[in-house]
Amino acid sequence: MSAKFEISFSKSAKLTGGLAILLKTTDADSAAGAETVDPAGVIAKAARIARFSAKSMSALDIVAPEGASVERIVVIGLGKAADLTAHDWLKAGGTAAARIKNTDKTAVFIDVPGRETSARAAADFALGMLLRTYSFDTYKTKKNDDEEKAGKSVKVTIVTTDPAGAKKAFSDSEAIAGGVNLARDLVNEPPNVLGPVEFAAKAKELEKLGIEVEILTEKEMRRFGMGALLGVAQGSVRPPRLAVMQWKGGKAKDRPVAFIGKGVVFDTGGISIKPAAGMEDMKGDMGGAAAVTGLMHVLASRKAAVNAVGIIGLVENMPDGNAQRPGDIVTSMSGQTIEVINTDAEGRLVLCDALWYCNDRFKPQFMINLATLTGAIVVALGNVHAGLFSNDDQLSAQLTEAGLSTNEKLWRMPLGKDYDKLIDSKFADMKNTGGRQAGSITAAHFIKRFVQDTPWAHLDIAGTAMGSPQDEINQSWGSGFGVRLLDELVRAHYES
Protein backbone atom coordinates (compact mmCIF):
# COMPACT_ATOMS: atom_id res chain seq x y z
CA MET A 1 0.00 0.00 0.00
CA SER A 2 1.25 3.48 -0.83
CA ALA A 3 0.74 6.55 1.31
CA LYS A 4 -1.94 8.71 -0.22
CA PHE A 5 -0.57 12.12 -1.05
CA GLU A 6 -3.02 14.71 -2.33
CA ILE A 7 -0.48 16.92 -4.10
CA SER A 8 -1.26 20.43 -5.30
CA PHE A 9 0.86 23.36 -6.47
CA SER A 10 0.52 26.98 -5.41
CA LYS A 11 2.40 30.28 -5.26
CA SER A 12 1.80 30.40 -1.51
CA ALA A 13 0.56 28.25 1.34
CA LYS A 14 -1.65 28.95 4.32
CA LEU A 15 0.34 27.71 7.28
CA THR A 16 -1.85 26.68 10.18
CA GLY A 17 -0.24 23.72 11.87
CA GLY A 18 1.22 20.67 10.17
CA LEU A 19 4.67 20.39 8.62
CA ALA A 20 6.75 22.78 6.53
CA ILE A 21 9.54 21.38 4.36
CA LEU A 22 12.24 23.73 3.11
CA LEU A 23 15.11 23.10 0.70
CA LYS A 24 18.60 24.50 1.16
CA THR A 25 21.75 24.44 -0.93
CA THR A 26 25.24 24.70 0.49
CA ASP A 27 25.82 28.02 -1.25
CA ALA A 28 22.70 29.80 0.04
CA ASP A 29 22.53 31.67 3.33
CA SER A 30 19.00 30.47 4.04
CA ALA A 31 16.35 28.08 2.79
CA ALA A 32 13.53 29.20 0.53
CA GLY A 33 10.45 29.99 2.60
CA ALA A 34 12.43 30.52 5.79
CA GLU A 35 11.22 34.11 6.14
CA THR A 36 7.61 32.87 6.00
CA VAL A 37 7.94 29.84 8.26
CA ASP A 38 10.63 31.00 10.64
CA PRO A 39 10.68 34.74 11.28
CA ALA A 40 12.39 34.16 14.63
CA GLY A 41 15.45 32.50 13.06
CA VAL A 42 15.05 29.11 14.73
CA ILE A 43 16.28 27.26 11.64
CA ALA A 44 19.62 29.05 11.57
CA LYS A 45 20.16 28.39 15.27
CA ALA A 46 19.20 24.69 14.97
CA ALA A 47 21.44 24.27 11.91
CA ARG A 48 24.37 25.80 13.77
CA ILE A 49 23.88 23.57 16.80
CA ALA A 50 23.41 20.41 14.68
CA ARG A 51 26.23 21.41 12.31
CA PHE A 52 23.84 21.00 9.42
CA SER A 53 25.71 21.88 6.22
CA ALA A 54 22.96 21.13 3.65
CA LYS A 55 24.91 18.21 2.20
CA SER A 56 22.93 16.47 -0.54
CA MET A 57 19.90 14.60 0.84
CA SER A 58 20.72 15.37 4.47
CA ALA A 59 17.82 16.50 6.65
CA LEU A 60 17.33 18.67 9.72
CA ASP A 61 14.13 18.04 11.69
CA ILE A 62 13.01 20.83 14.02
CA VAL A 63 10.09 21.07 16.43
CA ALA A 64 8.68 24.52 15.79
CA PRO A 65 8.75 26.93 18.74
CA GLU A 66 5.68 28.17 20.58
CA GLY A 67 3.72 30.64 18.48
CA ALA A 68 5.01 29.38 15.11
CA SER A 69 2.53 28.87 12.29
CA VAL A 70 3.53 25.18 11.88
CA GLU A 71 4.26 22.32 14.26
CA ARG A 72 7.40 20.95 12.60
CA ILE A 73 10.00 22.21 10.16
CA VAL A 74 12.20 19.94 8.04
CA VAL A 75 15.10 21.37 6.06
CA ILE A 76 16.46 19.13 3.28
CA GLY A 77 19.96 19.68 1.95
CA LEU A 78 20.52 19.72 -1.80
CA GLY A 79 24.29 20.20 -2.02
CA LYS A 80 25.55 22.79 -4.51
CA ALA A 81 22.86 24.54 -6.55
CA ALA A 82 24.93 24.33 -9.74
CA ASP A 83 25.21 20.53 -9.42
CA LEU A 84 21.48 19.80 -9.16
CA THR A 85 20.15 17.25 -11.67
CA ALA A 86 16.67 15.99 -12.48
CA HIS A 87 17.36 12.89 -10.42
CA ASP A 88 18.35 15.05 -7.43
CA TRP A 89 14.85 16.52 -7.46
CA LEU A 90 13.41 13.00 -7.36
CA LYS A 91 15.69 12.10 -4.47
CA ALA A 92 14.75 15.27 -2.61
CA GLY A 93 11.09 14.38 -3.01
CA GLY A 94 11.76 10.91 -1.66
CA THR A 95 13.74 12.31 1.26
CA ALA A 96 10.87 14.68 2.03
CA ALA A 97 8.26 11.92 1.83
CA ALA A 98 10.16 9.87 4.40
CA ARG A 99 9.87 12.79 6.85
CA ILE A 100 6.12 13.24 6.54
CA LYS A 101 4.83 11.53 9.65
CA ASN A 102 2.06 12.24 12.13
CA THR A 103 0.58 15.05 10.07
CA ASP A 104 -2.30 15.43 7.66
CA LYS A 105 -0.97 18.50 5.84
CA THR A 106 2.41 19.60 4.58
CA ALA A 107 3.72 22.65 2.74
CA VAL A 108 6.90 22.29 0.67
CA PHE A 109 8.82 25.41 -0.34
CA ILE A 110 10.63 24.15 -3.39
CA ASP A 111 12.24 27.23 -4.93
CA VAL A 112 15.97 27.45 -4.31
CA PRO A 113 17.58 30.86 -3.68
CA GLY A 114 19.91 31.87 -6.50
CA ARG A 115 18.57 29.32 -8.97
CA GLU A 116 15.42 29.21 -11.06
CA THR A 117 13.36 26.14 -10.19
CA SER A 118 11.47 24.86 -13.22
CA ALA A 119 7.98 23.43 -13.32
CA ARG A 120 9.58 20.15 -14.35
CA ALA A 121 11.74 20.16 -11.19
CA ALA A 122 8.64 20.66 -9.04
CA ALA A 123 6.93 17.76 -10.81
CA ASP A 124 10.03 15.58 -10.40
CA PHE A 125 10.07 16.39 -6.68
CA ALA A 126 6.44 15.26 -6.45
CA LEU A 127 7.25 12.09 -8.42
CA GLY A 128 10.01 11.29 -5.94
CA MET A 129 7.45 11.54 -3.15
CA LEU A 130 5.10 9.12 -4.89
CA LEU A 131 7.85 6.60 -5.63
CA ARG A 132 9.29 6.68 -2.09
CA THR A 133 6.04 6.01 -0.30
CA TYR A 134 5.24 2.79 -2.16
CA SER A 135 4.96 -0.26 0.08
CA PHE A 136 3.62 -3.77 -0.44
CA ASP A 137 1.70 -4.96 2.61
CA THR A 138 -1.27 -6.65 0.98
CA TYR A 139 -0.87 -9.85 2.98
CA LYS A 140 -0.07 -8.36 6.39
CA THR A 141 -2.94 -8.83 8.84
CA LYS A 142 -1.14 -7.03 11.67
CA LYS A 143 0.49 -3.68 10.99
CA ASN A 144 2.60 -1.37 13.11
CA ASP A 145 1.71 2.29 13.60
CA ASP A 146 3.75 3.50 10.61
CA GLU A 147 2.13 0.90 8.34
CA GLU A 148 -1.35 1.85 9.52
CA LYS A 149 -0.65 5.52 8.84
CA ALA A 150 0.74 4.76 5.37
CA GLY A 151 -2.76 4.38 3.99
CA LYS A 152 -4.01 7.71 5.33
CA SER A 153 -4.31 10.75 3.11
CA VAL A 154 -1.89 13.67 3.49
CA LYS A 155 -2.46 17.00 1.75
CA VAL A 156 0.79 18.32 0.29
CA THR A 157 1.04 21.83 -1.12
CA ILE A 158 4.19 22.46 -3.16
CA VAL A 159 4.94 26.17 -3.23
CA THR A 160 6.55 27.23 -6.50
CA THR A 161 6.68 30.25 -8.82
CA ASP A 162 4.96 28.36 -11.67
CA PRO A 163 2.15 26.27 -10.17
CA ALA A 164 0.25 25.96 -13.45
CA GLY A 165 3.31 24.61 -15.26
CA ALA A 166 4.11 22.26 -12.39
CA LYS A 167 0.55 20.92 -12.36
CA LYS A 168 0.71 20.22 -16.08
CA ALA A 169 4.07 18.45 -15.78
CA PHE A 170 2.82 16.50 -12.76
CA SER A 171 0.18 14.72 -14.83
CA ASP A 172 3.04 12.84 -16.51
CA SER A 173 4.66 12.23 -13.11
CA GLU A 174 1.48 10.57 -11.85
CA ALA A 175 1.43 8.36 -14.95
CA ILE A 176 5.05 7.34 -14.36
CA ALA A 177 4.46 6.59 -10.68
CA GLY A 178 1.45 4.48 -11.59
CA GLY A 179 3.49 2.41 -14.05
CA VAL A 180 6.49 1.95 -11.76
CA ASN A 181 4.31 0.96 -8.83
CA LEU A 182 2.33 -1.47 -11.00
CA ALA A 183 5.61 -3.15 -11.97
CA ARG A 184 6.63 -3.26 -8.30
CA ASP A 185 3.30 -4.82 -7.34
CA LEU A 186 3.69 -7.53 -9.97
CA VAL A 187 7.23 -8.43 -8.87
CA ASN A 188 6.29 -8.43 -5.18
CA GLU A 189 3.22 -10.67 -5.55
CA PRO A 190 3.69 -14.21 -4.20
CA PRO A 191 3.97 -16.91 -6.88
CA ASN A 192 0.98 -18.88 -5.62
CA VAL A 193 -1.16 -15.82 -6.38
CA LEU A 194 0.40 -14.61 -9.62
CA GLY A 195 0.64 -17.40 -12.17
CA PRO A 196 0.74 -16.99 -15.96
CA VAL A 197 -3.05 -16.79 -16.24
CA GLU A 198 -3.33 -14.28 -13.40
CA PHE A 199 -0.51 -12.13 -14.82
CA ALA A 200 -2.24 -12.13 -18.20
CA ALA A 201 -5.41 -10.94 -16.48
CA LYS A 202 -3.44 -8.04 -14.97
CA ALA A 203 -2.28 -7.10 -18.46
CA LYS A 204 -5.87 -7.34 -19.68
CA GLU A 205 -6.85 -4.68 -17.13
CA LEU A 206 -4.87 -2.13 -19.16
CA GLU A 207 -7.73 -2.12 -21.66
CA LYS A 208 -9.43 0.47 -19.44
CA LEU A 209 -6.61 2.87 -20.40
CA GLY A 210 -7.22 2.35 -24.11
CA ILE A 211 -4.64 -0.39 -24.70
CA GLU A 212 -5.63 -3.27 -26.98
CA VAL A 213 -4.76 -6.56 -25.25
CA GLU A 214 -4.75 -10.05 -26.76
CA ILE A 215 -3.99 -13.17 -24.75
CA LEU A 216 -2.60 -16.17 -26.65
CA THR A 217 -3.31 -19.54 -25.07
CA GLU A 218 -1.21 -22.70 -25.25
CA LYS A 219 -3.27 -23.93 -28.20
CA GLU A 220 -2.64 -20.73 -30.17
CA MET A 221 1.07 -20.70 -29.35
CA ARG A 222 1.35 -24.30 -30.49
CA ARG A 223 -0.27 -23.31 -33.78
CA PHE A 224 2.41 -20.62 -34.21
CA GLY A 225 5.12 -23.21 -33.51
CA MET A 226 6.44 -21.67 -30.28
CA GLY A 227 8.18 -24.86 -29.22
CA ALA A 228 10.90 -23.10 -27.22
CA LEU A 229 8.49 -21.22 -24.95
CA LEU A 230 6.14 -24.20 -24.60
CA GLY A 231 9.03 -26.48 -23.69
CA VAL A 232 9.72 -24.36 -20.61
CA ALA A 233 6.07 -24.45 -19.58
CA GLN A 234 5.47 -28.19 -19.96
CA GLY A 235 6.61 -29.08 -16.43
CA SER A 236 3.98 -26.89 -14.77
CA VAL A 237 0.29 -27.56 -14.24
CA ARG A 238 -0.26 -23.83 -14.80
CA PRO A 239 -0.76 -23.13 -18.51
CA PRO A 240 1.42 -20.52 -20.28
CA ARG A 241 0.18 -17.32 -21.81
CA LEU A 242 1.52 -14.72 -24.24
CA ALA A 243 0.07 -11.25 -23.66
CA VAL A 244 0.19 -8.79 -26.56
CA MET A 245 -0.48 -5.15 -25.65
CA GLN A 246 -0.85 -2.38 -28.24
CA TRP A 247 -0.97 1.36 -27.59
CA LYS A 248 -1.89 3.31 -30.73
CA GLY A 249 -1.06 6.90 -29.85
CA GLY A 250 0.89 7.76 -32.99
CA LYS A 251 0.00 8.14 -36.63
CA ALA A 252 -1.66 5.14 -38.27
CA LYS A 253 1.19 4.76 -40.78
CA ASP A 254 3.94 4.83 -38.13
CA ARG A 255 5.63 1.53 -37.34
CA PRO A 256 5.49 0.72 -33.63
CA VAL A 257 8.30 0.55 -31.13
CA ALA A 258 8.33 -2.82 -29.36
CA PHE A 259 9.15 -4.02 -25.86
CA ILE A 260 9.32 -7.70 -24.94
CA GLY A 261 9.51 -9.04 -21.38
CA LYS A 262 10.54 -12.34 -19.86
CA GLY A 263 7.71 -13.47 -17.60
CA VAL A 264 8.83 -16.58 -15.72
CA VAL A 265 6.43 -16.22 -12.81
CA PHE A 266 8.43 -18.71 -10.74
CA ASP A 267 11.69 -20.35 -11.66
CA THR A 268 12.78 -23.49 -9.83
CA GLY A 269 15.32 -24.14 -12.56
CA GLY A 270 13.28 -27.11 -13.72
CA ILE A 271 15.11 -30.45 -13.82
CA SER A 272 18.38 -28.48 -13.52
CA ILE A 273 16.99 -27.40 -10.18
CA LYS A 274 18.30 -24.43 -8.24
CA PRO A 275 19.60 -24.62 -4.65
CA ALA A 276 16.88 -24.20 -2.02
CA ALA A 277 18.55 -21.19 -0.39
CA GLY A 278 17.14 -18.04 -1.93
CA MET A 279 14.79 -19.83 -4.31
CA GLU A 280 11.90 -17.78 -2.91
CA ASP A 281 13.35 -14.78 -4.75
CA MET A 282 12.59 -16.49 -8.04
CA LYS A 283 9.06 -15.13 -7.82
CA GLY A 284 10.76 -12.05 -9.28
CA ASP A 285 11.97 -13.79 -12.42
CA MET A 286 9.20 -12.02 -14.29
CA GLY A 287 10.71 -8.58 -13.65
CA GLY A 288 11.11 -7.97 -17.38
CA ALA A 289 7.44 -8.67 -18.05
CA ALA A 290 6.50 -6.47 -15.09
CA ALA A 291 8.55 -3.58 -16.49
CA VAL A 292 6.96 -3.91 -19.94
CA THR A 293 3.48 -3.95 -18.39
CA GLY A 294 4.31 -0.92 -16.27
CA LEU A 295 5.71 0.91 -19.29
CA MET A 296 2.56 0.31 -21.33
CA HIS A 297 0.56 1.67 -18.39
CA VAL A 298 2.65 4.87 -18.45
CA LEU A 299 2.43 5.38 -22.21
CA ALA A 300 -1.34 5.02 -22.20
CA SER A 301 -1.86 7.08 -19.04
CA ARG A 302 0.04 10.06 -20.39
CA LYS A 303 -1.37 9.60 -23.92
CA ALA A 304 2.07 9.20 -25.48
CA ALA A 305 2.17 10.16 -29.16
CA VAL A 306 3.64 6.85 -30.28
CA ASN A 307 2.54 3.43 -31.46
CA ALA A 308 3.94 0.88 -29.01
CA VAL A 309 3.72 -2.88 -28.64
CA GLY A 310 4.39 -4.75 -25.40
CA ILE A 311 4.68 -8.54 -25.46
CA ILE A 312 5.22 -10.70 -22.39
CA GLY A 313 5.84 -14.45 -22.38
CA LEU A 314 4.34 -15.92 -19.21
CA VAL A 315 5.38 -19.37 -17.98
CA GLU A 316 6.28 -21.26 -14.82
CA ASN A 317 9.46 -23.39 -14.82
CA MET A 318 8.85 -26.46 -12.65
CA PRO A 319 10.30 -29.98 -12.28
CA ASP A 320 7.76 -32.68 -13.10
CA GLY A 321 7.39 -36.01 -14.83
CA ASN A 322 6.46 -34.05 -17.93
CA ALA A 323 9.17 -31.40 -17.55
CA GLN A 324 11.74 -30.57 -20.19
CA ARG A 325 15.01 -32.50 -19.80
CA PRO A 326 18.64 -31.57 -20.42
CA GLY A 327 19.37 -32.99 -23.85
CA ASP A 328 15.94 -32.26 -25.30
CA ILE A 329 15.82 -30.56 -28.69
CA VAL A 330 12.98 -28.11 -29.36
CA THR A 331 11.96 -26.22 -32.48
CA SER A 332 11.38 -22.49 -32.09
CA MET A 333 8.84 -20.40 -33.99
CA SER A 334 11.68 -19.29 -36.29
CA GLY A 335 12.23 -22.92 -37.34
CA GLN A 336 15.65 -22.96 -35.69
CA THR A 337 16.29 -25.93 -33.41
CA ILE A 338 17.68 -25.65 -29.89
CA GLU A 339 19.43 -28.24 -27.76
CA VAL A 340 18.47 -27.70 -24.12
CA ILE A 341 21.66 -28.14 -22.12
CA ASN A 342 20.38 -26.57 -18.91
CA THR A 343 16.69 -26.19 -18.08
CA ASP A 344 17.60 -23.28 -15.80
CA ALA A 345 18.59 -21.26 -18.87
CA GLU A 346 14.91 -20.96 -19.69
CA GLY A 347 14.31 -17.23 -20.02
CA ARG A 348 16.02 -17.03 -23.38
CA LEU A 349 13.78 -19.84 -24.64
CA VAL A 350 10.73 -17.77 -23.73
CA LEU A 351 12.16 -14.62 -25.28
CA CYS A 352 13.23 -16.15 -28.58
CA ASP A 353 9.68 -17.10 -29.55
CA ALA A 354 8.21 -13.84 -28.25
CA LEU A 355 10.77 -11.79 -30.21
CA TRP A 356 10.23 -13.74 -33.42
CA TYR A 357 6.46 -13.39 -33.09
CA CYS A 358 6.81 -9.64 -32.51
CA ASN A 359 9.11 -9.09 -35.47
CA ASP A 360 7.05 -11.26 -37.81
CA ARG A 361 3.72 -9.65 -36.94
CA PHE A 362 4.50 -5.98 -36.22
CA LYS A 363 7.70 -5.15 -38.19
CA PRO A 364 8.69 -2.67 -35.45
CA GLN A 365 11.18 0.22 -35.59
CA PHE A 366 13.16 -1.57 -32.89
CA MET A 367 12.77 -4.32 -30.31
CA ILE A 368 13.98 -4.00 -26.73
CA ASN A 369 13.70 -7.02 -24.48
CA LEU A 370 14.04 -6.94 -20.70
CA ALA A 371 14.85 -9.99 -18.62
CA THR A 372 16.20 -11.04 -15.26
CA LEU A 373 18.31 -13.35 -17.37
CA THR A 374 21.66 -14.22 -15.80
CA GLY A 375 23.40 -14.27 -12.46
CA ALA A 376 26.56 -13.53 -14.40
CA ILE A 377 25.46 -9.94 -15.04
CA VAL A 378 25.13 -9.41 -11.28
CA VAL A 379 28.69 -10.65 -10.81
CA ALA A 380 29.88 -8.25 -13.52
CA LEU A 381 27.85 -5.12 -12.72
CA GLY A 382 26.34 -5.65 -9.28
CA ASN A 383 23.12 -3.79 -8.50
CA VAL A 384 24.21 -0.46 -10.02
CA HIS A 385 23.94 -0.98 -13.78
CA ALA A 386 21.85 -3.28 -15.93
CA GLY A 387 23.62 -4.98 -18.82
CA LEU A 388 23.00 -3.58 -22.31
CA PHE A 389 23.59 -5.71 -25.39
CA SER A 390 22.68 -4.42 -28.83
CA ASN A 391 23.17 -4.75 -32.57
CA ASP A 392 22.56 -1.02 -33.09
CA ASP A 393 24.84 1.83 -31.97
CA GLN A 394 22.19 4.54 -32.22
CA LEU A 395 19.68 2.62 -30.11
CA SER A 396 22.43 1.84 -27.58
CA ALA A 397 23.37 5.51 -27.33
CA GLN A 398 19.75 6.53 -26.85
CA LEU A 399 19.25 3.93 -24.13
CA THR A 400 22.45 4.92 -22.35
CA GLU A 401 21.38 8.57 -22.42
CA ALA A 402 17.94 7.70 -21.04
CA GLY A 403 19.58 5.61 -18.33
CA LEU A 404 21.74 8.51 -17.20
CA SER A 405 18.77 10.88 -17.28
CA THR A 406 16.62 8.63 -15.06
CA ASN A 407 19.48 7.10 -13.03
CA GLU A 408 18.38 3.66 -14.27
CA LYS A 409 21.86 3.14 -15.57
CA LEU A 410 23.02 0.77 -18.30
CA TRP A 411 26.47 -0.53 -19.23
CA ARG A 412 27.03 -1.76 -22.77
CA MET A 413 28.57 -5.21 -22.97
CA PRO A 414 30.43 -6.74 -25.93
CA LEU A 415 29.09 -9.01 -28.65
CA GLY A 416 31.15 -10.84 -31.26
CA LYS A 417 31.66 -13.99 -33.33
CA ASP A 418 34.06 -15.48 -30.80
CA TYR A 419 31.26 -15.44 -28.24
CA ASP A 420 28.53 -16.48 -30.66
CA LYS A 421 30.24 -19.73 -31.62
CA LEU A 422 30.12 -20.84 -27.97
CA ILE A 423 26.40 -21.64 -28.36
CA ASP A 424 26.82 -23.80 -31.46
CA SER A 425 25.52 -27.34 -30.89
CA LYS A 426 26.61 -30.72 -32.26
CA PHE A 427 23.01 -31.90 -32.46
CA ALA A 428 20.90 -28.81 -33.23
CA ASP A 429 21.23 -25.32 -34.67
CA MET A 430 22.27 -24.01 -31.27
CA LYS A 431 22.29 -24.84 -27.58
CA ASN A 432 20.73 -22.76 -24.83
CA THR A 433 23.88 -22.15 -22.82
CA GLY A 434 27.52 -21.63 -23.68
CA GLY A 435 28.97 -22.70 -20.36
CA ARG A 436 30.15 -20.76 -17.33
CA GLN A 437 32.42 -18.25 -19.05
CA ALA A 438 30.87 -15.06 -20.47
CA GLY A 439 27.44 -16.30 -19.43
CA SER A 440 25.62 -13.00 -19.92
CA ILE A 441 27.21 -12.48 -23.33
CA THR A 442 26.42 -15.93 -24.69
CA ALA A 443 22.85 -15.55 -23.43
CA ALA A 444 22.59 -12.30 -25.38
CA HIS A 445 24.00 -13.99 -28.47
CA PHE A 446 21.35 -16.68 -28.19
CA ILE A 447 18.62 -14.03 -28.23
CA LYS A 448 20.34 -12.14 -31.06
CA ARG A 449 19.85 -15.13 -33.35
CA PHE A 450 16.10 -14.42 -33.32
CA VAL A 451 15.97 -10.70 -34.13
CA GLN A 452 17.21 -10.75 -37.75
CA ASP A 453 18.20 -7.24 -38.94
CA THR A 454 15.79 -5.30 -36.73
CA PRO A 455 17.50 -2.81 -34.38
CA TRP A 456 17.49 -4.59 -31.05
CA ALA A 457 18.66 -4.23 -27.48
CA HIS A 458 18.65 -6.74 -24.66
CA LEU A 459 18.60 -5.41 -21.10
CA ASP A 460 19.72 -7.94 -18.49
CA ILE A 461 18.10 -6.55 -15.34
CA ALA A 462 18.85 -9.45 -12.98
CA GLY A 463 20.76 -7.17 -10.60
CA THR A 464 18.44 -4.18 -10.70
CA ALA A 465 14.85 -5.45 -10.90
CA MET A 466 14.69 -7.06 -7.47
CA GLY A 467 16.60 -6.95 -4.22
CA SER A 468 18.66 -3.94 -5.28
CA PRO A 469 19.80 -1.54 -2.53
CA GLN A 470 17.07 0.71 -1.19
CA ASP A 471 17.47 4.42 -1.82
CA GLU A 472 15.64 7.75 -1.59
CA ILE A 473 12.95 6.79 -4.13
CA ASN A 474 12.74 3.03 -3.71
CA GLN A 475 12.13 1.11 -0.50
CA SER A 476 10.62 -1.90 -2.28
CA TRP A 477 12.13 -5.33 -2.97
CA GLY A 478 10.77 -5.14 -6.49
CA SER A 479 12.16 -1.88 -7.86
CA GLY A 480 10.20 -1.36 -11.09
CA PHE A 481 13.50 -0.85 -12.91
CA GLY A 482 13.15 -0.11 -16.60
CA VAL A 483 9.80 1.68 -16.60
CA ARG A 484 11.18 5.22 -16.20
CA LEU A 485 14.16 4.42 -18.43
CA LEU A 486 12.07 3.27 -21.39
CA ASP A 487 9.46 5.98 -20.96
CA GLU A 488 12.28 8.54 -21.20
CA LEU A 489 13.63 6.80 -24.32
CA VAL A 490 10.23 7.03 -26.00
CA ARG A 491 9.63 10.60 -24.85
CA ALA A 492 13.03 11.86 -26.00
CA HIS A 493 13.30 10.13 -29.38
CA TYR A 494 10.17 8.38 -30.66
CA GLU A 495 7.05 10.46 -30.08
CA SER A 496 5.56 12.13 -33.14
Swiss-Prot record:
UniProt-annotated location(s): Cytoplasm
Catalytic activity: Release of an N-terminal amino acid, Xaa-|-Yaa-, in which Xaa is preferably Leu, but may be other amino acids including Pro although not Arg or Lys, and Yaa may be Pro. Amino acid amides and methyl esters are also readily hydrolyzed, but rates on arylamides are exceedingly low; Release of an N-terminal amino acid, preferentially leucine, but not glutamic or aspartic acids
Pfam families: Peptidase_M17 (PF00883), Peptidase_M17_N (PF02789)
Cofactor: Mn(2+)
Chief location category: cytoplasm
Residues binding Mn(2+) 2: K262, D267, D285, E346
Active site positions: K274, R348
Gene Ontology CC terms, in alphabetical order: cytoplasm
Binding positions for Mn(2+) 1 per the UniProt entry: D267, D344, E346
SUPFAM superfamilies for this protein: Macro domain-like, Zn-dependent exopeptidases
Described purpose of this protein according to its UniProt entry: Presumably involved in the processing and regular turnover of intracellular proteins. Catalyzes the removal of unsubstituted N-terminal amino acids from various peptides.
HAMAP family named among the record's database cross-references: Cytosol_peptidase_M17
Name under which the protein is recorded: Probable cytosol aminopeptidase
Organism: Rhizobium leguminosarum bv. trifolii (strain WSM2304)
Gene name linked to the record: pepA
